[in-house]
Amino acid sequence: MTKFDNVMHNSAAHRIIFNVPNKSSNRDGTPKVKAHFVYDLETRGLNATDPIFGACIKMETNEEWVFSCMKSMRKHFEAHTPCVAWAHNGSKFDIFGILNKEECYESKKILGGTVIYELELNGVLYRDSKHLLNLPLSKLAKSVGMEKGITPKGF
């Protein structure tokens, strides 16, 4: 795991997600969620099960990390439970780079037909921001005057 500056710092989707309201505490005053992460996996194509690297930002502190091992990224999330990990189009792509299909199948889920809204495993709530912001990242970025980054071909 390495610290990496400005990986996702300017992402409009990530800033918008952090502003989504949630119930912040249980009846006894303890936090329901201690941390909110936004993550993204980069791959050599459309195979989410073989990512090159993953990057995440902790929204409360703006700390950023890059992981070459997705098991390390998952352990990082699990070390901050209870937490929420958001990815844009995560339920159709990114989640499969972090969890295997058996874990996805066996975990607690909030579903709408075949659509996964939330998947919970080991205290981490994996959520898909595409259900809140139903645009591709390229159009979402453009709507707020930004550009979506592209992974260099040399990776």
Model-derived features: positions:
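Cross-family signature of deubiquitinases and ubiquitin-like deconjugating cysteine proteases
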Residues: M1-M8, A12, F37, N47, ...
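Detector for Asparagine
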Residues: N6, N10, N19-N22, N26, ...
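Conserved DEDDh/DEDDy metal-dependent 3′-5′ exonuclease domain
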Residues: C56, E60-F155
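Short acidic, Gly/Ser-rich segments with clustered Asp/Glu that frequently serve as metal-coordination loops
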Residues: L41-T49
